[in-house]
């Protein structure tokens, strides 16, 4: 490895231990643009009795479907249509809608609301079923209900589970204040899980979606914590000598892989989700970092410079004592930040290309790898729970922003709209239990 390459990789490792630059408060609005000719035309009528609600459910549904890039919203007019009404399939088809949604909202005796809807296929002229959902009469409850309806529509019409009712985590810096934010999948309803005057990096969702592991510098060094979202309780997972970084959950949620400089060069260890049972997994004289479990729990992918330059390797989840690490990436001379798709078929990573850093996706069966972005300062990729999209951090207009792109590269990436701010370290949460 040349001195420049070695210094570059060490700078990369160091950059994992510093936070984003200053910015004003950021509001994320997630938008993923699809290919118009492949978008599914659908009409979602206003639901009966929803006009008086704090948040209209159908506005959330329409926004979700449009944001996915897979649907085109056909104007359904302003007249509410209940799910009990007879459907004139020909009329809706004439409007250009291949599917139609009707529904209603009713108040329950306990003050909650029941939302009923039915999805129709106007081409085959048949019902595709629906749901009856109970929700609280507040903005959060109505938003969640809208996301659930959009998920139902997405799965019924496209055959893939939707990810609208999932959450994002990311880090925002305002001046010298850092916030770990948890938001809906559309970037709305963001709430701080942690606010600190010291950097916060590397948030990672637990498989249950109830916990987030992250690295905080509040003790004047990088320490790995777990934050229990329902209770707000948090606790230390790794505070070993040196740097503690890059937490990654095992699929069963019982173990985390972490990168520690306990003995000098950064190596990969495992630790239980309670912070006990520290076990070393790699034993090289190089830098081993950024671990990530395969969905079946059999492998850990990681970044290492053991071959002379940063590349992605994989080893048995039990460590190199259970089997030698094998190199995975061969396209390009500098590859980092491995993330595996939920079905285990794709590897997303960051590759240095032409002086910049681009998000690549590799087919793990064929080894074919392709850039899926046109940005040049990409970092921190994170797959959606259905594997259809990748969220990542990049630079745009001199600001640190988030972007999303279809994992198959079928459409260009979309920079997320922010209002005066820099945000980094994205992590897309799992399906909600």
Curated annotation (Swiss-Prot):
UniProt KW keywords: Cell cycle, Cell division, Periplasm, Signal
Lineage top rank: taxon: Bacteria
A GO BP annotation: protein import
Subcellular localization: Periplasm
Signal peptide: 1-26
Family matches, as Pfam families: PD40 (PF07676), TolB_N (PF04052)
GO cellular component, one term: periplasmic space
Subunit structure: The Tol-Pal system is composed of five core proteins: the inner membrane proteins TolA, TolQ and TolR, the periplasmic protein TolB and the outer membrane protein Pal. They form a network linking the inner and outer membranes and the peptidoglycan layer.
Physiological role: Part of the Tol-Pal system, which plays a role in outer membrane invagination during cell division and is important for maintaining outer membrane integrity.
UniProt record similarity statement: Belongs to the TolB family.
Protein name: Tol-Pal system protein TolB
Gene that this polypeptide is encoded by: tolB
